[in-house]
Amino acid sequence: MSQSPRFVTRRGGSLKAAPGAGTRRNESQDYLLMDELGDDGYPQLPLPPYGYYPSFRGNENRLTHRRQTILREKGRRLANRGPAYMFNDHSTSLSIEEERFLDAAEYGNIPVVRKMLEECHSLNVNCVDYMGQNALQLAVANEHLEITELLLKKENLSRVGDALLLAISKGYVRIVEAILNHPAFAEGKRLATSPSQSELQQDDFYAYDEDGTRFSHDVTPIILAAHCQEYEIVHTLLRKGARIERPHDYFCKCTECSQKQKHDSFSHSRSRINAYKGLASPAYLSLSSEDPVMTALELSNELAVLANIEKEFKNDYRKLSMQCKDFVVGLLDLCRNTEEVEAILNGDAETRQPGDFGRPNLSRLKLAIKYEVKKFVAHPNCQQQLLSIWYENLSGLRQQTMAVKFLVVLAVAIGLPFLALIYWCAPCSKMGKILRGPFMKFVAHAASFTIFLGLLVMNAADRFEGTKLLPNETSTDNARQLFRMKTSCFSWMEMLIISWVIGMIWAECKEIWTQGPKEYLFELWNMLDFGMLAIFAASFIARFMAFWHASKAQSIIDANDTLKDLTKVTLGDNVKYYNLARIKWDPTDPQIISEGLYAIAVVLSFSRIAYILPANESFGPLQISLGRTVKDIFKFMVIFIMVFVAFMIGMFNLYSYYIGAKQNEAFTTVEESFKTLFWAIFGLSEVKSVVINYNHKFIENIGYVLYGVYNVTMVIVLLNMLIAMINSSFQEIEDDADVEWKFARAKLWFSYFEEGRTLPVPFNLVPSPKSLLYLLLKFKKWMCELIQGQKQGFQEDAEMNKRNEEKKFGISGSHEDLSKFSLDKNQLAHNKQSSTRSSEDYHLNSFSNPPRQYQKIMKRLIKRYVLQAQIDKESDEVNEGELKEIKQDISSLRYELLEEKSQNTEDLAELIRKLGERLSLEPKLEESRR
């Protein structure tokens, strides 16, 4: 009995083609398909069943030749199976059976793959094409889930790890889940194994060919999923126990790091970057950390530090650091109420001590300011929260006009002594709470500093129209008084200035104690304060030394009653000096040094006004631009000093032999060379500075050339370069002025959020009752700890003495103590074991303990962030990803329909055969009846 032939397509059309060539490839495949079918869609020639291929080899070769001919005629290249020019390896040539198998796996021919896996027992499922890809990799690359599931059921399947990486890179979630269900991932160790580690195990789990996988050797599945921002895949891998190990410190000298650095330093650096790319991925940050805000902030700072260390990868690390900062800003942007904003800014408040006076501690915001996450600090949600804290206990003042606020500031400045008295007497009263508010503290300190500047101005007011005493004159109040006693003594105005300076020194000491020396020196404004106060202190000390020496001389005169008029007697040298006019003083006189230092300190004091300028929207950006300009000037000074010193020494060497032989003293000494070249920058030096009175034209011409080159280099080149740098910095500030200003204002505000510094200078010198109470409480706590420590020490000594006595009398009689000791030892071991177990189960506490409020809020925010990221990704890939998926579905459906059609053809042929047999039997039955 004959059987209807079954039609099998060798290689069907695929819509998963190279970009831009999909239509042509489909047309060629459809053309070949119609060659095997008749006009009515039925097979022209009978084909043998599966597993019987030798008789069909000639037809296969003919079809392959025709396919290649058609493709060449269409003007495109097709990556054919078998040897190629670049990959000509005859030892791995494929049989017709293997080629058919790989074709079916690549183009989604599910029926062919299923039947070949079931019926072809000699089939090598790990056979590879000319590119070294096996059937599993081809099926995964073309998103054929059903074929992938069929192949994963086979034992000894190779390249499973590479197939997983490929599925992750393409974002095929269902295929990733199918591969993760493979027995190779049952223990989870494979998820933490990179291709390089797999090579050490000498297996083909990740093997691609002799050159390695298509992915980097140090990339694990979780790292690749994080790189590709595949949130669902990252979540799946994290549930399987996969984690990204943080790289060791850059300067780590452990054995592992030393070997990697010695073996291949470039590969070691790239592996670090790949790991940090995974750690800085928003997908990994949002799904792996219990506190993603804290993790992202610390990681951004770590990456910024690495950018300054590894200069060759600076751009990569900076990009990753900015990615972490953008992640934090994205979370803050998704907040919908004040509770969520406070959770991000404060962190886990339940595990931390509350802020001062019930004020939020803003621990995360402190970290953001420290790491200069400017967009986070300048975000409207953050600024609104800061503004509410800034006007604490003065909410009505927030909506007032600028005129009303100015009147409040003026009233505080005038009534500052009375407000300080109220706070001393009743620090916990309503007025005391208002004075502890950040805004009132800022106003009080600003008013105090303004008064200090006013004192500096008033101290010099008596000399505005010129001094009444010339430098060569002396003046005294009586005949027995030395002139220096009148000039070196401190006036009442200077005593007020000294009290302000002492108060500021005390405030800085408290700040150093609170912040620590490292944090204190990190702020540049603190360095300015330190320099200003140090110069003031040095000036006053020098002034006091001058007054002390003058007082000693005056005491000698006061002890001698015979000296009635100092102008009519001859004084000793040790006394006479202190009665001389100013022009006869020594250059190193303490009073002269004091006056010079005082002038510098006054300049620095007025420059300190720039600290409070960020509080104003108009002056804040200007102050920021000024600060950036100062930084540019310091950078410029390196090149400037190098060029300046070169010409200064050169011109000095040229003219140092002509002292007295020039029209002026320029360049004859190092000092004159410095003055001449410095003022030449501003066009204030004369050309005749290089002229010699004698006929030494060679030296003079060289001087002209060097002086001209100096002016061209300094004035035309370097100064214009400095102007360009300043202009560029100003433009950067101007382009992002709002963010820069809000960040600077937040730093200013934050300095007044901390506890303390309520009373401004100089009222802070008087200790308040609250400060005395806190001091007594701290002293009491310290004494209790000291006494408790002594008691514990006495108990330990007593136990030690008891044990020593037991050893003397023998241990046999103390079985109870031994049993107690053994029980204590067992209890200690149990405690150690339980503590170890608790540390290992730290990440599982969320399952056993109820989640805290902070965890609930972060969970909500992370959900919103992930959903928003998925929506953005889908909108970006709507034209590309969905189209590819549709193509693959159509391709698989096509083969299924062809298989169903072939099966229906067989059934129809069987029915026709049976019908023919019945029709042929009917005449015979009629004849037999007759």
Curated annotation (Swiss-Prot):
Side Cytoplasmic, residues: 1-437, 508-520, 613-635, 727-930
Please indicate the ranges of residues that lie on the Extracellular side.
459-486, 542-591, 657-705
Q: What ranges does the record give for the region Disordered, renumbered to this chain?
A: 1-27
Question: Which biological process annotations from GO are given for this protein?
Answer: cellular response to hydrogen peroxide; cellular response to hypoxia; negative regulation of dendrite morphogenesis; neuron differentiation; positive regulation of calcium ion transport; positive regulation of cytosolic calcium ion concentration; positive regulation of neuron differentiation
Where do glycans attach? 560
Q: How does it sit in the membrane?
A: Multi-pass membrane protein
Q: List the disulfide bonds.
A: none
Gene3D superfamilies in UniProt = 1.10.287.70, Ankyrin repeat-containing domain
Q: GO MF terms on file? A: actin binding; actinin binding; ATPase binding; calcium channel activity; clathrin binding; inositol 1,4,5 trisphosphate binding; monoatomic ion channel activity; protein homodimerization activity
Gene Ontology CC annotation, any one: slit diaphragm
Describe the protein's quaternary organization and the partners it interacts with: Homodimer; forms channel complex. Interacts with MX1 and RNF24.
UniProt lists the family membership as follows: Belongs to the transient receptor (TC 1.A.4) family. STrpC subfamily. TRPC6 sub-subfamily.
What is the recorded name of this protein?
A: Short transient receptor potential channel 6
